[in-house]
Amino acid sequence: MPNWKKVIVSGSDAHLNTLELTNTTTNDSILVTSTDAGSSAAPVITLKRNSGSPADSDYLGQIKFKGENDADQEVVYSKISGKIQDKADGTEDGIIEFSNIKNGAATITARLKSDKLELLNSTSLEVAGNIDIPDDAILNIG
């Protein structure tokens, strides 16, 4: 395996549209290590969409989990997406969205918003343990 220190793409006609890494073992395909001794978050991986016209509900980035089915077809079994909920300066809100294959169709199963967790499209909540609800909480059933 190459021991690269840097990958540099430069020049007016140099474009890297897709970087593909292939690993024939179950070892890490990508390992990002920080040796910083401080308490700040590290290492950091950033997915940035630099849109000239950002809008509410825009997707910002996505992590896809792919595999193959029994017909040897590539399938996106699940994905995690970042979205803009509110783009207004000073009141920005974001969403983390979870999608899974459900009966053969891509289905949004959960959204984590700034003020709530939504379980969608007949996704159930199952808890192995206790759910503690504070005395001053309002619980609506049905």
Predicted regions: what they are:
Residues 70-71, 88:
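Residues at alpha-helix boundaries and short interhelical turns
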